[in-house]
Amino acid sequence: MNRTAFATLAAASLLAAAPAFAAEVTDQQAAAPDVAGRAGATAVADVIVTANRSAQPIERVGASVTVLTQAAIEARQTPAVAELLAQTTGVSFTRNGGVGTTTGVNIRGAESQHTVVLIDGVKLNDPSSTQGGFNFGNLLVGDTARIEVLRGAQSTLWGSQAIGGVVNIVTAEPTEALQGSLDAETGSRGTTYFRGGIGGANDRLSWRLAASRYDTDGFSAYATGTEDDGYTNTGLSGRLNLKITEAVSLDLRSVWSSGQNDFDAFNGDSREYGKTRELVGYAGLNFDLLDGRFRNRIGYAYTDTNRRNYNPATLVQPLTFDAAGENRRWEYQGTFAVNEALNTTFGIESERTEMRTRSPSAFNLNPAFARGQADLDSAYAQVQWTVLDGLTLTGGLRYDDHAQYGDNLLGQVAAAWALNEGDTVVRASWGQGFRAPGLYELYSEYGNLTLRPEEFDSWEVGVEQRLFDRAVVTATYFNRQADNEIRYNGCSTPSTDPLCTVNGVGRWGYYKNVQKTEAQGVELIGRVDVTERLNVSANYTWTDAKSASGVTDGKRLTRRPEHMANLAADYDWAFGLKTGLAVRYVGETFNNDANTVVVGEYTLVDIRASYPINDNLEVYGRVENAFDEEYQTVLNYGTAGRGVFGGVRVRF
């Protein structure tokens, strides 16, 4: 896409935002889940945000939050969560091929490992991954009912890694005595996606079971390759809530997935494939005191990720990679409403993370696992005080005691001021971040036990304006400073670097603290109900993320676009048909630290439609990448061309 086209799309973002050039922040995203479409849009005061650990009206939140409702998710029709998130403000992603391959999500230019990912409040980040981040490659919509994206440093409440932000995925809960859902679709590249769930609720018990299956022949993960790289994913989930008494209840939840994806190297086709299994479990006891003013939760959360890669061409030892990561967390959380104006949230956590990893080869058929373990005990507290009508102040502290890195204290403050009967909302927040080195960075074959923790400071200020009961515009400026960021450092041959040799044997490289980085940017969001049937929404993000030290001082961080924009228009026809158009622009990025290798800009256009046959049955379809744009998010890795998909939804 040329600069003129980009300027046109950016201008459309501002026009959709209507007369004022002000205000992003958290609410617009609730009022119109960014550009996810009109479906699911609700009034600001009605939206409850749980991403900061306690339900509250979004106009009282001082940070930036995007909320995608179930209606918005269904309207978008996108199976992959990473692609859904990319339609929201400040979010970009990279992927080494098609759905199922390694996928990283960046929020506000932060590293992918600086995003904490949750399912129903349980952390998913894999301690055996290269820098402890979460691979979005296997995360499909499944039984998702809601997605909340909290942007900016959130380490006070969510701990280590919550630097760029938090993504909280909420699974569906039943509201009727018996209800179910079934979605089935098929389309290009031999793709099929089936998902369904059934559950029920009464005064004492609610339950739901869900399953999904995704299959695709795919396309070559190597950009100029000729063989298709397919992907399959099977998912299961379940949840149960039992009300023991009016004040005591039991929660049980679990999510399981198993995926297999073909993948290529960066320089050509291969027959390699990987298998990933992920298990998430939670058990919790909830009890209320003081007529519900004092709510308590004691819980145990467990995640287990197992990954294996195979190369059938290596007959002696086809297994080329074997890793597993586990998180075990005991937690207590309390919320106490002192009065209508003053609320507190506090808790303690004890977490153990473990990982093992090895890389067999024809030269070493059965190497020993590199193993690592870390224990972390934490306590946090947050106070939210509505000082006067419309003005809410929030402050919090977190204390971490890390087995290897000792104690650390973090702080965060925020303010939200609703003016003009809520039509104008001003927000500001400041927070600190802290990330201890991951287990892979410390103990793998590339590990370095001398690593220091990463430290961050971030702040933002924004304003939202509602106009004529038809439009919302928001604007936010953000800034983040980082010290001691950890990067992979390659070793030359021969090398005089002592860390390039372990037990007398040279290695490819190791992790080290090499960098200060800084990021600043502007996020703009707008939505306007042009008519009762036509809704237009848009967002634009400018991100200046760059190195601030060493030989790369002033260079942009790799694979972080400076410009991103989304535009969507949705029309509800009088006879029931719903149609929508979505346009996404991503500016050029650099594929290396020296900024000498460019990955080009691109524009994607998607078209979607749905039609209700009756109250229980709906048909839908979409065209992805309608103009068959050729593009890459990572150099030399392929992306999907034009695709046509159609399906049915059944609700009962």
Whereabouts are the PLM-identified features?
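N-terminal periplasmic accessory domains that precede
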Residues: 81-84, 103-106, 115-118, 134-140, ...
